[in-house]
Design a protein with these regions (language model features):
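N-terminal subdomain of nucleotide-sugar transferases
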Residues: 1-62, 105
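Donor nucleotide-sugar binding/catalytic pocket of nucleotide-sugar-dependent glycosyltransferases
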Residues: 139, 158-214
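Acidic donor-binding loop of glycosyltransferase active sites
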Residues: 177, 279, 291-308, 319-322
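Conserved catalytic-core segment of nucleotide-activated headgroup transferases in glycan assembly
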Residues: 192, 202-295
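Short hydrophobic beta-strand element within catalytic cores of glycosyltransferases
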Residues: 312-318, 322-326
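Conserved acidic donor-binding segment of nucleotide-sugar-dependent glycosyltransferases
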Residues: 341-348, 356-362
Length: 397
């Protein structure tokens, strides 16, 4: 089939959660279909585009910039139009013009919108069956985020937008021929937005073990590690909660333990905290994360808001890392407490779980082995993505 894959970010290199998911779907689709990728790009990504052209039938891109001053204009437009801010912000005339040109040249069988932001573009592809690939139930993610915020302008904005997102997401899920959800929990949330039940294809986010070799951790590995894009509000909330509520308990027993916070664009407040306390190592983006994995006695995902599946958990398990997360953090992932990971939801319990991994090397190694085996048997992309073909055939009759 002729597939048009629409992405909000270029899915290569797979250096963030959404890009990992899309990258593995793209690889799978390119093996079986004539795949055209259309994506927004930021800055000079010519090397990444060249690599993607070796995999896809064609790659087309549209530049996009994000500026705080522009966001104020999009917020005003969102208020006036009563449409979700995220959708208004990514509605660009240049993308619509490119798609009009491509659709005049090619009759696509499938318009595959990767994430809700790109659904508005799939809608304009004539004659194609529309698929929404939902990385999460976006309305629920923003509702959970709003629930964690104190009173203030940010809470008002998120509280307004999750309600608009719920209405918008529900409409898309009713109108598109096919929906891909990453978990049963997300399927339920999407159906709530629709106001009705519907058939959806539930496919977990998948990874490629060939790209995720087992990490040989240092014998004296004793750092705590968090990896994630640090401009993403759920990650900011998670790291701040860990620093404020959990780390002081850990430091009572191990006062010199270092917390490595690795990820793109950390907020200035977090950078300043790292400058004031040498035990907080705020790195920003790093090309090679392996040295941080090697030093880590515990990998943490202390998330309290968000939705979908946490790719960082899949990556860490695939590389044999001992891991502590919250119940919400491992939502949608078939892990078992004390077998594959440690799960804790209160500061005291989370601190105790981290301390167990830092002090019990045998337990840490055991969890790492079992976690990697879980990924091998359940979350490898070659098997996990196969139902996409079934969905394509179904929607094309």
């Amino acid at each position: 089939m002729k597939i048009l894959l629409l992405t909000q970010v270029l899915p290569y290199p797979p250096d963030s959660g959404p890009k990992v998911k899309t990258w593995n779907v793209l690889k799978y689709l390119a093996q079986n279909h004539e795949l055209t990728l259309v994506s927004f790009v930021r800055g000079d990504q010519s090397a990444e585009i060249a690599h993607l052209k070796t995999i896809c039938h064609a790659v087309h891109t549209v530049p996009i910039e994000r500026k705080a001053v522009d966001d104020m204009g999009y917020l005003l437009k969102s208020v006036l139009s009563n449409q979700p801010f995220l959708m208004v912000r990514d509605d660009r005339a240049a993308m619509r013009q490119l798609l009009a040109q491509l659709c005049a040249q090619t009759q696509f069988d499938i318009a595959h919108a990767d994430q809700l932001n790109m659904a508005q573009y799939a809608e304009q592809v004539p004659g194609a069956a529309k698929i929404l690939d939902a990385h999460n139930a976006l309305w629920l993610l923003y509702k959970r985020l709003a629930d964690t915020l104190g009173l203030g302008p940010q809470k008002l904005i998120y509280s307004r937008d999750w309600r608009l997102l719920k209405k918008y997401e529900g409409r898309i899920c009713r109108e598109f021929e096919g929906i891909l959800a990453v978990s049963q929990e997300d399927k339920t949330a999407l159906e709530e937005a629709m106001g009705q039940a519907r058939e959806m294809t539930v496919i977990p986010i998948a990874v490629d073990l060939d790209e995720l070799p087992l990490i040989e951790r240092n014998p004296d590995a004793d750092h705590i590690l968090h990896i994630g894009t640090m401009y993403w509000p759920p990650n900011i909330d998670a790291v701040n909660w860990f620093i404020d509520e959990v780390l002081p308990i850990i430091h009572q027993s191990r006062p010199q333990t270092i917390f490595d916070i690795v990820g793109l664009r950390p907020p200035q407040e977090l950078v300043e905290r790292g400058q004031q306390d040498p035990r907080l190592n705020v790195t920003g983006y790093v090309e090679d994360t392996e040295p941080y994995y090697q030093k880590a006695g515990a990998f943490i995902v202390p998330v309290r808001a968000g939705g979908g599946m946490r790719v960082k958990i899949l990556n860490a398990l695939a590389q044999g890392m001992p891991l502590v997360t919250t119940t919400l953090g491992c939502e949608g992932i078939a892990v078992t407490h004390e077998k594959d990971v440690l799960i804790a939801d209160t500061p005291q319990a989370f601190a105790e779980a981290v301390l167990r991994l830092l002090t019990d090397r045998a337990l840490a190694e055991q969890l790492g082995r079992r976690g990697r085996e879980l990924i091998r048997t359940t979350y490898d992309y070659r098997a996990a993505c196969q139902p996409i073909d079934d969905l394509y055939r179904q929607v094309k009759g």
